[in-house]
Amino acid sequence: MKVLNLGSKKQASFYVACELYKEMAFNQHCKLGLATGGTMTDLYEQLVKLLNKNQLNVDNVSTFNLDEYVGLTASHPQSYHYYMDAMLFKQYPYFNRKNIHIPNGDADDMNAEASKYNDVLEQQGQRDIQILGIGENGHIGFNEPGTPFDSVTHIVDLTESTIKANSRYFENEDDVPKQAISMGLANILQAKRIILLAFGEKKRAAITHLLNQEISVDVPATLLHKHPNVEIYLDDEACPKNVAKIHVDEMD
């Protein structure tokens, strides 16, 4: 597991955007696992700049989002469909829509939708890179504490802490969906390479637990210790004291 403090959200996001760009440039049929939320805004902004500057052919790139709120239509401003369109797919409108995969949070039968999305993941095979954030309680995707390590795509009851943390995106806390559809922990670990981003003081405790705690369902992110190729990029505020700062221009 590689852990790097790149000083700021902007610097870390730029570095990871370059990694995604290089993957798409050198592997035009690559499969990318994507994440959403406040952590990822600079990442997509930087990635869009790189894509527009170089007019990269992404017609054969496939994307797979981690999760979606249950009960929100794709057109809802707080849905992750809407987020991905606003942050990436409308900013660089050359991704092939048939290769964009995001769970449907407004399906009539959500358990059937979870099974359907899991089938897509299995049929498409390993993602080349999986992008992750981390919740204040150590969740990855929407896999809350207590989620079995062998879980696949499923419907999640969101914890009070997750609802409270996400309420800043809604008019009030009561508007935050109480459930989500999420890749399971087993799905996440199927990726060839995992890149986790964490920014801000509120994420420091979760990162500290991830790095120092034994593998436990109480902190789902600790499962990443079982994966052979994990990279964690932090800013100063999220970084535990024992992780040294490094500048992007010092990296390979």
Swiss-Prot record:
SUPFAM superfamilies: NagB/RpiA/CoA transferase-like (SSF100950). PROSITE patterns: GLC_GALNAC_ISOMERASE. It catalyses: alpha-D-glucosamine 6-phosphate + H2O = beta-D-fructose 6-phosphate + NH4(+). Pathway: Amino-sugar metabolism; N-acetylneuraminate degradation; D-fructose 6-phosphate from N-acetylneuraminate: step 5/5. GO terms for biological process: carbohydrate metabolic process; glucosamine catabolic process; N-acetylglucosamine catabolic process; N-acetylneuraminate catabolic process. The active site is at D67 (proton acceptor), N137 (for ring-opening step), H139 (proton acceptor), E144 (for ring-opening step). One of its GO terms (molecular function) is glucosamine-6-phosphate deaminase activity. Keywords: Carbohydrate metabolism, Hydrolase. InterPro entries: Glc/Gal-6P_isomerase (IPR006148), Glucosamine6P_isomerase (IPR004547), Glucosamine6P_isomerase_CS (IPR018321), NagB/RpiA_transferase-like (IPR037171). GO terms for cellular component: cytoplasm. Disulfide bonds: none annotated. Its EC number is 3.5.99.6. Belongs to the glucosamine/galactosamine-6-phosphate isomerase family. NagB subfamily. PANTHER family: GLUCOSAMINE-6-PHOSPHATE ISOMERASE (PTHR11280:SF5). Catalyzes the reversible isomerization-deamination of glucosamine 6-phosphate (GlcN6P) to form fructose 6-phosphate (Fru6P) and ammonium ion. This is Glucosamine-6-phosphate deaminase. The lineage of its organism: Bacteria, Bacillati, Bacillota, Bacilli, Bacillales.
